[in-house]
Amino acid sequence: MRLVTTREASRLTGLSTYKLREWASRRALIPADVPPKSQGSPARYSWQTILLLRIAVTLRDRFHLELQAHRQVLTGLHTSLRTTSFVSLWGKSLVIDPDQCWSWIDDADFDAVKGDAILIRLSPHLDALSQDFALPRPSRMPGQLDLFPARPIAGPPSPTPASIQSAPHQSHRGRKSAGGRRE
């Protein structure tokens, strides 16, 4: 399983490294999968923990919830995500009711929610994670998964045929002068 460092987790969640450390260590809301070995070394996070952190950021920023009051929900989600496959979460939403009970529902089943609840669509979060963790995305064909998830490749761009043709052609031979001699 691929784990990312605190710096990458900060980028993926939108949390500052200070806030991420506070949530993972000091307040112990969502602990890192691998705590730092020593002071100055980074903690490591799995896709499940990053997804949970993204959900927590959404609850805090969009719904203005105090996360300490919803610690039980976060703990239950963390436990559930440990045994849930990434692929099975596509097309699902998280539902949290006022009694702090939560469930995964299909995006098409919003009518099944009775009463008041907070709904968080998972697809935008999974989309971001699938790129950074090289996890599979849903296939356009039902029941078909990507054999090898595409990973971004970093490096200098290769020259295009147009840029090669537009480069001036340089000859290593001298030009002939009017008298037939090479210059």
Ranges and model annotations:
Residues 1-23:
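Polyanion-binding surface elements
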Residues 17-41:
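Major-groove DNA-recognition helix of helix-turn-helix-type DNA-binding domains
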Residues 32-58:
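Short helix-start
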